[in-house]
């Protein structure tokens, strides 16, 4: 599935991933290929991307995620 992570300043990440684990406002959750459509707010925490057997971690400071049709868009306030 395709993932984009965007902040007000720049596009932080764009690529094909196997899964993404997000810090939801009501607890963490994971999105995999063919996930049901979802829109959720994000809390401050770790966003973990898994692609080709490798993990990459970003720290997001809140935001919103939208997932539909194997496209995931993360709009984050900031990313470290």
Regions found by a protein language model. Name each.
Residues 2-80:
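Compact, glycine-rich, soluble single-domain proteins
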């Amino acid at each position: 599935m395709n993932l984009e992570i965007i902040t007000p300043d720049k596009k932080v990440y764009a690529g094909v991933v196997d899964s993404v684990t997000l810090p939801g406002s009501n607890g963490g959750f994971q999105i995999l290929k063919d996930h049901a459509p979802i829109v959720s707010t994000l809390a401050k925490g770790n966003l973990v991307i898994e692609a080709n057997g490798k993990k990459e971690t970003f720290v997001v400071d809140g935001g919103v995620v939208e997932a539909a049709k194997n496209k995931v868009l993360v709009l984050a306030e900031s990313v470290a």
